């Protein structure tokens, strides 16, 4: 076989491989797009249900009316009037593994009634323990500035997760300050 025939055969085979790879990639992309389109509403609904459950967990009320937050704290995502019981504040402080999305209940006296972690990407077995009841219970009844013991406060930091503990403490402080700004 001549050198020209070998080169032409090799080029044809390469073109065939490229076209095949492109077709497989296009089919996979199309399938992923279809799955995303089918599940996007379910995912949004599940996230909304999780957020509503977090509101009820930190401060029970018949309704949660959104308020306009005009403060400068960028960790405050939303503030809700929880009927006559007080307020629920969604905050996103920055933890070790990224933002920690959490709800903080605040009564009419400016006291934390509870916290609920909605979403986080903290290290499993360390920072992820911030969602455990024992850690979250420390914040109930706190007002003013909340800090871990290492920073002069009275919140016991999670072992090996001081950054996460500080982030949650800062989130609670931000929520308390946001409610105080409302008057």
Model-based region annotation:
Residues 2-183:
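Flexible, solvent-exposed loop/hinge segments and secondary-structure transition points
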